[in-house]
Amino acid sequence: MKINEILREQIKNEIPRERCCLVTALKVALRLYGTLHITGRGFMVEFKKEDPALLRRTIRLFKAVFPSHKDLEILFDDKKYWVQIYGPRSVWQELNLFSEKEGFLPDVSVTRDCCLMQFVREVVLYKGYLVNFEEGYQLEIREPGPFTGILMSTLEKWEIKHYSYPGRLLIKGGEHLFAFLNRLNCQETVERLARYREFKKDKDQTVRLTNYSMANLNRQVDGYEKIRLVLEEIRKGPGLEALPPPLREI
């Protein structure tokens, strides 16, 4: 498994238990990759994602939040799947896709601490990347878009050191990254990343020892080749028997 997939796999496979956290997970997914339409059948949200596992996860989340809602259509072509979900205004209002006062796409509302943690987990799932991991611990959150303000205020609240650049946030260094992951209850990922890091160290050490041994072997071969040429000249000249016993033994 690639290093970047370790964190995503844990978050993707862990479905929240509380309904408020399920709603928060849906808010992030649909705001990032959903499109709200007005059709003859009412409001419809179309969710597209190239990763079918994330599409299935979103459908599972929606059914968990709205178990009585059955109006879902799963479509596909040769390259990807997507889902169309029809529902009344009340559904999309709860998911912060529509507001009677603000209209379409109002600000995302996250209040409870458990929901805030789930919010950050979902953003990391879709927008987080572990980069240059062989050189050092570093997590990049790319193009968080409408969630930038909430992310930055949350990191400051959690006292996680981070760096802000246009279109991305960075968390650098093992101490800060592991503190961030522990805040997200991603201890399994922390342990796996630590094992991965040790594996890389052992692998690099093995490569260095192998290169050192090969260099020594090459020097020995080169030295033997030089001696062989000298001995060949002696054999063609006076002969090995003409040498004193100590030199002949060498």
Residue ranges and their predicted role:
Residues 18, 51, 173, 216-219, ...:
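Helix N-terminus capping/helix-initiation residues
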Residues 3, 7, 22, 54, ...:
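Alpha-helical structural motif
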Residues 1-42, 48-58, 62:
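N-terminal, positively charged regions that mediate nucleic acid binding
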Residues 183-250:
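Extended mid-to-C-terminal alpha-helical interaction segments
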Residues 15-23, 108-116, 241-246:
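Structural motif
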Residues 36-38, 132, 162, 228-233:
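Short acidic (Asp/Glu) and glycine-rich catalytic loops that position anionic groups and cofactors
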Residues 40-41, 49-197:
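DNA-contacting interfaces and partner/effector-binding or oligomerization modules
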Residues 26-31, 120-125, 248:
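Contiguous, well-ordered alpha-helical segments that form the cores/surfaces of helical PPI scaffolds
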